Amino acid sequence: MQYQNDLILRAARGEAVERTPVWLMRQAGRILPEYRAVREKLSGFIELCTTPALAAEVTIQPVDILGVDAAIIFSDILVIPEAMGLPYEMQESKGPFFPKVITSAADIDALLATDAADHLTYVYDAIELAVKELNGRVPLIGFAGAPFTILAYMIEGQGSKTFSKARRFLYTEPVLAHRLLEKITLATIAYLKRQVQAGAAMYQIFDSWAGVLPPDQYREFSLRYIKQICEAVPQVPRTVFSKGAFFVREDFNNFPCETVGLDWNMDIGESKKIIGPHKTLQGNMDPCALYLSEEQIRVKAKEMLDAFGTQSHIANLGHGLYPDTDKTKVKCFVDAVKEFGVKK
């Protein structure tokens, strides 16, 4: 497809760009009154995810309202365990909750793997609708959760500060852990292939809980499976965002992805040296910096851009937008990137 604005694709591929592209994790969400107006008419988050026309509508909202350089499909990383046979609920103000969790080999054997992707047609339909409506204005980003992050929820049953149950499972049941991770990986590969077929022009793998593991475990139980996914779905630019995994930045030097996401705790200059010049970096302003005044946000955005340089960088935050962030502050950040990110 030909895009009117393909900055993000060129930046991901390491090609020259006239300015730094920008998008935001959780850009389609509660920060937008327009999103809340759609959401309040429904039973909840999951109904919005599973209604293609509405998911497509809120996917496009940030492009129109904030002026970002890409849309990202409105969905959730936990649609994968749901499709595999482990349903979840999204509890208001508490987050995801799994009434049943994985505790045994029999539980794992009962899960679908590759065939799970067949149960996610609502996501592909939403992508197709959004791509059609965008009509080449900007690319659409697909995404999935990293297998370890998905396992963490399937074992723990909900969010956690420590994910001690999931981590204990890796120590005490490593064979079962790998069996579960292999199934999640197969499901994710099939899922991302279908997203690309539906029109996703690039994709991101979110390893939200990477930072809870020590380096050796992270390489064994997470990074190897992310690599398997990236190698299996190479048709479009690939971004890997391993939050908190500062200890494996060197591993990304020769990793099968085009872009590496940095969280706000990762020093930009140090990361550029460790990861190397042949990878595009994404990030990494602290989401809390958007609580500053607009003048201060502009200063912070310029500092970030100066540190990254105008090439091989996709501007973003170091994690998702917080729900109570002022929309005008978010727009200020996007506009600042567009102003200060111009190649000189």
Curated annotation (Swiss-Prot):
EC number: 4.1.1.37
Metabolic or biological pathway: Porphyrin-containing compound metabolism; protoporphyrin-IX biosynthesis; coproporphyrinogen-III from 5-aminolevulinate: step 4/4
The keyword Ribosomal protein is assigned to this record: no
Positions of substrate binding: R26, Q27, A28, G29, R30, D76, Y153, S208, H319
Source species, domain of life: Bacteria
InterPro entries hit by this protein: UROD/MetE-like_sf (IPR038071), Uroporphyrinogen_deCO2ase_HemE (IPR006361), Uroporphyrinogen_deCOase (IPR000257)
Subunit (UniProt): Homodimer.
Function comment: Catalyzes the decarboxylation of four acetate groups of uroporphyrinogen-III to yield coproporphyrinogen-III.
Name listed for the protein in its UniProt record: Uroporphyrinogen decarboxylase
Annotated gene: hemE
